[in-house]
């Protein structure tokens, strides 16, 4: 992974709810880390789609009890927090 660009993405928690996926944990399962911000969105969408497929049944169960409580928070757009080596942070809608 390119350490000059550390990327942490808010994604689905692990199924036991213990923690959230970290971007550099995910890329070891899928494909090499994108080297530029231009590639992060499309890369994130691919990972997001694969995880959605794998956890679809789990989310169908959770959605029945969860959706009416936080309907506005359950949008499909998730925010990526991009942290550069210089300390600058920016949020990217994926």
Swiss-Prot record:
Coiled coil stretches, renumbered: none
Disulfide bonds: none
Entry annotated with the keyword Repeat: yes
Sequence repeat feature ranges: 48-57, 58-67
Assigned keywords, A-Z: Repeat
GO biological process: amino acid transport
Repeat keyword on record: yes
Main function: Involved in ammonia regulation of the GAP1 permease.
Protein name: Ammonia regulation of amino acid uptake protein
Organism for this UniProt entry: Saccharomyces cerevisiae (strain ATCC 204508 / S288c) (Baker's yeast)
Gene transcribed to yield this protein: AUA1
């Amino acid at each position: 992974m390119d350490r000059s660009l550390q990327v942490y993405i808010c994604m689905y928690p692990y199924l036991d709810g213990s923690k959230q996926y970290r971007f550099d944990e995910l890329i070891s399962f899928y494909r090499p880390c994108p080297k530029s911000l231009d590639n992060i969105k499309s890369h994130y969408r691919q990972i997001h789609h694969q995880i959605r497929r794998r956890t679809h049944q789990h989310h169908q169960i959770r959605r029945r009890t969860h959706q009416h409580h936080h309907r506005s928070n359950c949008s499909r757009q998730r925010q990526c927090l991009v942290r550069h080596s210089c300390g600058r942070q920016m949020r990217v809608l994926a």
